[in-house]
């Protein structure tokens, strides 16, 4: 009798980034690591995803217009979602994580 390992779906990540190259790079990197990734270019797109998909992790550019609003809306729609803020990697900034 063969034993089967339980199936665990990959964590779902929402990448919110208005710079298309940054967004594509981050999303592709996460997909290579086995994450299921959704992308949004702005707060409105992100809220649409948050209303329809159970997101485990939200990764957003800290300089995004209405970023604070996005964090509030994310916590309202999905209180258990973790939020990570990033800065433009082309400027060699370090990723910063906000713990809630």
Model-derived regions: residue spans:
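Short, well-ordered alpha-helical microsegments
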Residues: 23, 47, 67-68
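Acidic, metal-coordinating helix/loop segments flanking the phosphotransfer/catalytic sites
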Residues: 39-57, 95-99
């Amino acid at each position: 009798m063969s034993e089967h390992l339980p199936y665990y779906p990959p964590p779902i990540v929402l990448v919110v980034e208005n710079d298309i190259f940054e967004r594509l790079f981050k999303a592709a990197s996460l997909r290579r690591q086995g994450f299921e990734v959704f992308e949004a270019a702005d707060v409105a797109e992100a809220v649409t995803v948050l209303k329809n998909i159970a997101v485990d992790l939200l990764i957003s550019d800290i300089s995004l217009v209405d970023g604070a609003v996005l964090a509030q809306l994310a916590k309202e729609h999905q209180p258990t979602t973790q939020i990570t803020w990033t800065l433009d990697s082309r400027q060699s900034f370090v990723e910063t994580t906000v713990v809630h």
